[in-house]
Design a protein with these regions (language model features):
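Extended terminal accessory/targeting regions
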Residues: 74-85, 156, 162
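N-terminal accessory interaction module
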Residues: 9-81
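Amphipathic alpha-helical packing elements
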Residues: 86-129
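Intrinsically disordered, low-complexity segments enriched in small/polar residues
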Residues: 25, 44, 51-52, 89, ...
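Charge-dense polyanion-binding interfaces
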Residues: 122-165
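Polar low-complexity intrinsically disordered regions enriched in Ser/Thr and small residues
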Residues: 30, 49, 56-57, 94, ...
Length: 165
């Protein structure tokens, strides 16, 4: 495996969205994971809430209900890394071949290195690479190792609407 360069300059990079989420008045969380991921929900208060655009788009949309506004739960690239690693998602397949969205903090070690190797081999520079590199460093510092293997449905963030428990 290749050595990963440590990214030391995160505070000087342009700020961008990592997670596009809102919480409705009844506590339900809507999460738009990618550009055309339109999510709508009828809240207990009778109002409909929606979210669209994921974190990648310059123009995202969400509900504007002045009588009962949704709470923004968006996370940006200048948030603490502890928060980013919980909400930065990557699409992949589970052991049954179903698409799942896995948070950075749950990606196995081989997957982290594989994404960086793939991007380098394809000549792709992703603004998210620096967070994958930071996750690798974070795991070294905290002695975290996630065994390589196939993901299960439980590993992913598969629902885009999370009901308050």
């Amino acid at each position: 495996m290749k050595m990963i360069k440590k990214f030391n300059n995160m505070e000087n990079q342009e700020r961008f969205m990592i997670a596009n989420r809102i919480q409705t008045p009844d506590g339900t969380i809507l999460w738009s994971r990618y550009r055309h991921d339109y999510v709508a929900y009828d809240d207990a208060n009778g109002e409909q809430y929606m979210l669209d655009g994921g974190p990648d788009i310059l123009c995202w949309r969400s509900s504007v209900n002045k009588s009962a506004p949704a709470k923004s739960l968006q996370v940006f690239s200048d948030a603490p890394f502890e928060e980013i690693r919980q909400v930065m998602l990557r699409g992949t397949k589970d052991k049954d071949g179903n698409e799942i969205w896995i948070p950075l903090c749950k990606m196995n070690d081989l997957h982290l290195f594989g994404v960086l190797d793939y991007n380098e081999n394809m000549g792709i520079h992703s603004k998210y690479d620096k967070f994958i590199e930071k996750e690798i460093e974070y795991r070294k510092e905290h002695n975290i190792h996630i065994e390589d293997g196939r993901y299960s449905k439980e590993d992913g963030v598969n629902n885009i609407i999370f009901k308050k428990k």
